[in-house]
Amino acid sequence: PVNLECSINPEIIDIVCKLKPARATLVPENRNEVTTEGGLDIKGNYEKLQKAIDKLHANEIEVSLFIDPKNEIIELSSQLEVEWIELHTGTFANVYAMLHTNLSQTHHTIKELELSKAELKSKLEKSIKEIESSSKFAKKLNLKIAAGHGLNYQNVTLISKIPEIIELNIGQSIIARSVFTGLEKAILDMKELIKND
């Protein structure tokens, strides 16, 4: 089934309703729709979101919201009566990269994460616990849980072990690897990493 990522722009929602994907994941498009971490600003866009969600539901399209892993935001998402949430894993991915790669030694370094190894390990553990806790909370609210943003072949297993998360949205990493291995092998390699026997 097709999961189409889109903004809450009314013109875009009209197009999505004509296309009729199985699911639409509402994501930030403008700076004013983004939280500091990167998920949708649910509070600031509640009424616009409700209109978009109502229209999508009227067209028999499931809705997912791309949100930060915070219980307050999950609660608001549940009140909007969406079927899915996608937890933003960008903070986790950034901390992982700063801890386990040479990112801090490049011009792409993340200034606010230029910390000691011990501090980065602590931040990584906190980030994983936050995603785990948010996933459990969302499941109690009968939401289906996906996760994505910055997931790759190095960090995905830590997230794939969270049993409440039933879908991982990984694009750039697979496509980048496929340039060297071919798409089929890139997909099979990722599937091998995320399977939980």
Model-derived features: where do they sit?
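Glycine/small-residue-rich loop that forms an oxyanion/phosphate-binding "nest" at active or ligand-binding sites
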Residues: 1-46
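Histidine/lysine/aspartate-rich catalytic loop segments that bind and position anionic ligands
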Residues: 31, 62-64, 68-128, 134
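Glycine-rich phosphate-binding active-site loops on the catalytic face of alpha/beta enzymes
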Residues: 26-33, 84-97, 164-183
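Hydrophobic faces of well-ordered beta-strands that scaffold small-molecule active sites
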Residues: 2-6, 24-26, 63-65, 85-87, ...
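C-terminal helical cap(s) of enzyme catalytic domains, especially alpha/beta-barrels
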Residues: 38, 97-114, 176-197
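Alpha-helix-loop-beta-strand connector modules within alpha/beta enzyme cores
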Residues: 1-6, 42-64, 109-146, 190-197
